[in-house]
Amino acid sequence: MSKVRVHNVTISLDGFAAGANQRLDAPFGDGVGWGDELHSWFVAATEDVAAGKTGIDADHLARGDRNIGATIMGRNMFGPQRGPWADESWKGWWGDNPPYHHDVFVHTHHPRPTLEMAGGTTFHFTDEPLETVLGRAVDAADGQDVRIGGGAAVIQQYLRAGLIDELHLVIAPMLIGRGERLLDNLGDGIDGYRVSEMVTSPAVTHVALVRR
Amino acid sequence: MSKVRVHNVTISLDGFAAGANQRLDAPFGDGVGWGDELHSWFVAATEDVAAGKTGIDADHLARGDRNIGATIMGRNMFGPQRGPWADESWKGWWGDNPPYHHDVFVHTHHPRPTLEMAGGTTFHFTDEPLETVLGRAVDAADGQDVRIGGGAAVIQQYLRAGLIDELHLVIAPMLIGRGERLLDNLGDGIDGYRVSEMVTSPAVTHVALVRR
């Protein structure tokens, strides 16, 4: 049976996955440079994986792509626009050949036509309920697992609903002060989870949550 | 010159130092057993220190008592009562011989007479401003450092005011979901701090914040 997994979601020491006021010229929100600092471990680990190196960060990063057949994300992760689409020229942050290579379901109150990209990535835009979208993603994954890509609000919704099987998050050694907290507004959903791993590399701390 | 230090403050993975509704029969607030779970590393490390053992947790724990000449705490850390003192029979959580053995300054809107305990601990109750209380504590420390003992609200106030030199906190691998967040409401105070250490033992992750 397909698992629902979250991987490589980076938060600051004070718990923020993104700052306030995300927008096109500041995809992680207000503040200079901290979006880069927050994800610097990710960039370094990506280079390590590409070079065939192993290590705590590279191993955790690579795990996130293994056996994933479909991805679900929030509209804010797909793009910086809010409200109705002014036009449909925006095709995501990732260029013509996005690094998914499978079906990606984008939760949005403003659906638009399905978008087929090079390399096998197809973006589906939907305002259906979580369970319906997850069902479609499981079908699309065809026996592989489904990844919830983010952002924080979407992960919270799936966690609160108890729909996530494994959540890997990464604590970066920095303070942001304000923005969007990942582990917040979880209600009783969190009672079903326990920490199964906590390990620190020279750069960050990796934490895994799994069902009790 | 005296430093102002915070040590061994334990927070959950989701950032809480205490739950909601702290009271006499639930000093860490609502919820069964998690106060014990949050601090289980502390109990084990205390036993290790007493037995002369070393290790990541024991070493961090012991550091918190080194070269400390005075302690500052909030009234909620001194006791579970709120509002005016019904009587003054409460003498803290720690019995007749508290583990401080120096002057302890308790921030409270409801001052009461100074309380001399066995073993050299003297509790002073004050509604003076942070800077005044810190000045008194520095004098009392007589060349040694001053420790801010807690709870979360008092640590936040000193951090926001930029008055803390070193902050050692401990992340326990558990979720609490609601309560009092330590790294919250810090305003621009946090801009003066950086993470100087992050290390994980088999039990917890230790993090140190210092001035930039």
Predicted feature descriptions by range:
Chain A
Residues 1-212:
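Enzymes that bind and transform nitrogen-containing heteroaromatic metabolites
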